[in-house]
A protein has these predicted regions:
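Metal-dependent de-N-acetylase/amidase catalytic core
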Residues: 1-12, 83, 92, 96-224
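Active-site rim/loop-helix segments in enzyme catalytic domains that contact anionic ligands
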Residues: 1-113, 144-147
Length: 224
């Protein structure tokens, strides 16, 4: 882990929705930032088509984009992210976007930021079509770079049976020391985090929180 912090001072995170950063990489990002890394988070959409409106509901279809934008800003602040970019794509439409446009947008970020490490979703193994399409766009953009100029790409994967296809994660991080930042990031997404498929509305004790959220796992993408 020390090697990650010292080697990767410019990190780019590319996810499609607010809260993807929270559950996937908030602890590791907080750790890297504390170690001196500069993190740019490019969030493709505002998750405006999400079905969760809070528990009990306090948002609606009209104001959800504004609320989720604010939640995203609060989440990034909780992690310590220095540079938050909202790219303005439409939620649940990433798979239908012009691939050339996605590649150009991400390629421009690569050219501007020169990251040495990128976090995204593993295309084909991250359940949601927006996740898969986002990860695929990142891989295409990085693949266009000369091999010796490509940043490392750490991917999150969690589809059913993914380990049979891509093996076990090769990057496993104990982020338990950064659970306060991670949980603050999760809880910033007030419209979302109590959904049954996420945290749920039950109270979690410290042992349960550490078990569920204290470890973050990634797959290094292997370019051919």
């Amino acid at each position: 882990m020390d090697n990650l912090i010292t080697r990767h001072q410019r990190i780019l995170v590319v996810f499609p929705h607010p809260d993807d950063e929270s559950f996937t990489a908030a602890g590791l990002l907080a750790m890297a930032i504390e170690g001196g890394s500069h993190v740019t988070y490019a969030c493709l959409t505002l998750g405006e088509m999400g079905r969760n409106m809070g528990f009990p509901p306090f948002a609606n279809r009209v104001n959800l984009p504004t609320i989720r934008k604010k939640e995203l800003e609060e989440s990034a602040e909780a992690i310590g992210i220095q540079d938050l970019r909202m790219l303005g794509f439409h939620d649940k439409m990433i798979e239908f976007e012009n691939p050339d446009l996605l590649d150009k947008v991400i390629g421009n970020l690569l050219e501007e930021l020169r990251p040495t490490l990128i976090f995204t979703f593993y295309p084909g193994y991250s359940v949601h079509p927006d996740h898969d399409a986002t990860g695929a766009a990142v891989i295409r953009a990085v693949e266009k770079l000369p091999a010796d100029e490509r940043p490392l790409v750490y991917c999150s994967a969690f589809s059913s049976g993914h380990e049979q296809a891509i093996g076990k994660a090769d990057i496993i991080i104990d982020a338990s020391s950064f659970l306060p930042q991670k949980m603050a990031s999760i809880q910033a997404h007030r419209t979302q985090f109590q959904a049954a498929e996420l945290v749920g509305n039950q109270e979690l004790n410290s042992k349960e929180i550490k078990r569920r959220f204290g470890t973050e796992s990634f797959w290094t993408y292997r370019f051919e």
